[in-house]
UniProtKB/Swiss-Prot annotation:
PROSITE patterns: AA_TRNA_LIGASE_II. The lineage of its organism: Bacteria, Bacillati, Actinomycetota, Actinomycetes, Mycobacteriales. It comes from Mycolicibacterium paratuberculosis (strain ATCC BAA-968 / K-10). It is found in: Cytoplasm. Keywords: Aminoacyl-tRNA synthetase, ATP-binding, Cytoplasm, Ligase, Nucleotide-binding, Protein biosynthesis. The keyword ATP-binding applies. Consists of three domains: the N-terminal catalytic domain, the editing domain and the C-terminal anticodon-binding domain. It is an enzyme of class 6 (ligase). InterPro entries: aa-tRNA-synt_IIb, aa-tRNA-synth_II, aa-tRNA-synth_II/BPL/LPL, Anticodon-bd, Anticodon-bd_dom_sf, Pro-tRNA-ligase_IIa, Pro-tRNA-synth_IIa_bac-type, Pro-tRNA-Synthase_IIa_type1. This is Proline--tRNA ligase. Coiled coil: none annotated. Its main location: cytoplasm. Pfam families: HGTP_anticodon, tRNA-synt_2b, tRNA_edit.
Length: 582
């Protein structure tokens, strides 16, 4: 196929959009691939849609290769199935809700576990019908509070979601690993650099869960890995290396001290190192207690205290994952006034226990560890408060920040952190959704068998931005051949009639060889055409310029940055096609 730029619906921009922060956002708009409609909403113009469709094609091929069958559900979904799984409430403000003229509730689908489960339940009733693997590629909707970074975080996006249904856990694990391998093949074909990390399931539920993160400095997800062992996990899923408990016998008794105006960890440490305690004190020797209000879906607000070493901050993502699906907020001044036993800056475990406040601590707070913490009175702290002797928590919580240098959970070495963009997430859901809908089939022994389920998502439209992030330079985009909107960008950089005719004939020859050609036949200067060719990012650029009279054209490899000359003649199109094949 030949597409003439003189007829293509395209307008490139020379300057970055004022609100664009990341390279993919800037380049996709400047190159005319997408256009903004409203916050978190984008139109796909011809070039962008071609890239999107090529990614979809690769995804379909790999899903079909593992036995997937494509279906399509509506995006507008009724309330009832989501009530059955409690996700109508759990999703909170993150979904778009609406009513029809009769007052019936609907939402715009953020994901489709409920509908897939009900459909399979309605169609199949025997173990002989399984395993089943269904998928769809469809627009999804989430009411992002802060859409950003172009099409990386939006309110409408294209996603491939697939679901496996099996009669036993062995079948579920097989489907899970088949998807894991299929995703690896997809990302290899897309030339996306990624890492597979352990993850949390969140509102999706289930047990085993892994994310595929595309490494990128603009990524919103922080992950850690151990270079010695290959361990990798999203920070929300990192399990803190727990120290061994220590004996409490022989430890000094806890002593309350007047510490003056010391409501912060920094001021407390400064006091401790001037108080003649007989040792140097750091923030890691202190125990700070953070107070929250927590509310389960449909429930009331309750107090929750979290104790962690004073040298650690609470990681909001880890805290959110640990409390899922509850919502939470930090206590404000009005809350402290309502609970006078909570002395801001001087809170200790004793007042929490005496007043029935649930108290969870960091896994490093093990029995036998000694701490400096609040004494529940203004200007007073207790030194030498020993866990397991002087106070006991109600449990542990993974809410503290993870740092470079922390020991890996597998004990193989230190952790190092990096940033990534989530491009896929796979779950072994188990029976959460089939339990909700009593999705049973008749087993081989004639007894009912509850189906077990897997869920596997892949961000198709996000992949366009991810590839743009990983494959660009200072001149513009550099699409891998597998997803590029065209195979060859043929630039006519010579006004000579014979050169133009030769370029057109070359485009026809390439078309006959199955090469998709973008022919720049515009009445524009060579400089403008070259800038656009570099910006658009088609992997191969053929220049019919001044060398045409000498019997040569230029072949530029946009991906590798190399240029060579090819002789004109009957074999020119075949030579170009051979170069494309490598």
């Amino acid at each position: 196929m030949i597409t003439r730029m003189s007829q293509l619906f395209l307008r490139t921009l020379r300057d970055d959009p004022a609100d664009a922060e990341v390279p993919s956002h800037k380049l996709l708009i400047r190159a005319g691939y997408i256009r903004p409609v409203a916050p978190g909403l984008y139109s796909w113009l011809p070039l962008g849609l071609r890239v999107l469709r090529r990614i979809e094609h690769i995804v379909r091929e790999e899903m079909n290769a593992i036995g997937g069958q494509e279906i399509l559900f509506p995006a507008l979904l009724p309330r009832a199935p989501y009530e059955a799984t409690n996700r109508w409430t759990e999703y909170g403000d993150s979904v778009f809700r609406l009513q029809d003229r009769r007052g019936n509730d609907y939402l715009l689908g953020p994901t489709h576990e409920e509908l897939f489960t009900l459909t399979v339940k309605g169609e199949y009733s025997s173990y002989k019908d399984f395993p089943v693997l269904l998928y769809q590629i469809q627009n999804k909707y989430r009411d992002e509070a802060r859409p950003r970074a172009g099409i990386l975080r939006v309110r409408e996006f294209v996603m491939k979601d697939s679901y496996s249904f099996d009669i036993d856990d062995a079948g579920l694990k097989a489907a899970y690993h088949a998807h894991r391998e299929a995703y690896q093949r997809i990302f290899a074909r897309l030339q996306v650099r990624y890492v597979i990390v352990s993850a949390v399931s969140g509102a999706m539920g289930g047990s085993a869960s892994e994310e595929f993160l595309a490494e990128s400095p603009v990524g919103e997800d922080t992950f850690v890995r151990c270079l010695e062992s290959g361990y990798a996990a999203n920070v929300e899923a990192v399990i803190t290396a727990r120290p061994d408990p220590q004996p409490v016998e022989g430890l000094p008794e806890a002593v309350v001290h007047d510490t003056g105006d010391t409501p912060t960890i920094a001021t407390l440490v400064d006091w401790a190192n001037r108080a003649g305690l007989g040792r140097a004190v750091t923030a890691a020797d202190t125990l700070k207690n953070v107070l929250l209000k927590v509310r389960q879906p449909g429930g009331d607000w309750e107090l929750l205290a979290i104790g962690l070493p004073g040298d650690r901050e609470v990681d909001d993502k880890r805290l959110g994952a640990a409390l899922e699906p509850a919502e939470y907020v930090l206590l404000d001044d009005a809350d402290f006034a309502r609970y006078p036993f909570l002395v801001k800056g001087y809170i200790g475990p004793k007042a929490l226990k005496d007043n029935g406040v649930r108290y969870l601590v960091d896994p490093r707070v093990v029995d036998g560890t000694s701490w400096i913490t609040g004494a529940d009175e203004p200007g007073r702290h207790v030194v030498g408060l020993v866990a397991g002797r002087d106070f006991t928590a109600d449990g542990t919580i993974e809410a503290a920040e993870v740092r470079d240098g922390d020991p890996s959970p597998d004990g193989a070495g230190p952790l190092v952190s990096a940033r990534g963009i989530e491009v896929a997430h796979i779950f072994q859901l188990g029976r959460k959704y089939t339990d909700a809908f009593t999705a049973d089939v008749l087993g081989e022994d004639g007894k009912p068998v509850r189906l077990t389920m897997g869920s596997y998502g892949l961000g198709v439209s996000r992949m366009v931005a991810v590839i743009a992030e990983q494959h660009h330079d200072e001149l513009g985009l550099r699409w891998p051949a597998s997803v590029a909107p065209f195979d060859v960008h043929l630039v006519i950089a010579n006004k000579d009639a014979q050169a133009r005719a030769g370029a057109t004939a070359l485009a026809d020859d390439l078309d006959r060889l199955g090469v998709e050609v973008l022919l720049d036949d515009r009445q524009a200067s060579p400089g403008v055409k070259f800038k656009d060719a570099e910006l658009l990012g088609v992997p191969w650029i053929v220049v019919v310029g001044r060398g045409w009279a000498d019997g040569v054209v230029e072949l530029r490899d946009r991906f590798a940055g190399q240029t060579r000359e090819l002789a004109t003649g009957p074999s020119l199109a075949a030579d170009i096609a051979a170069a494309l094949r490598g």
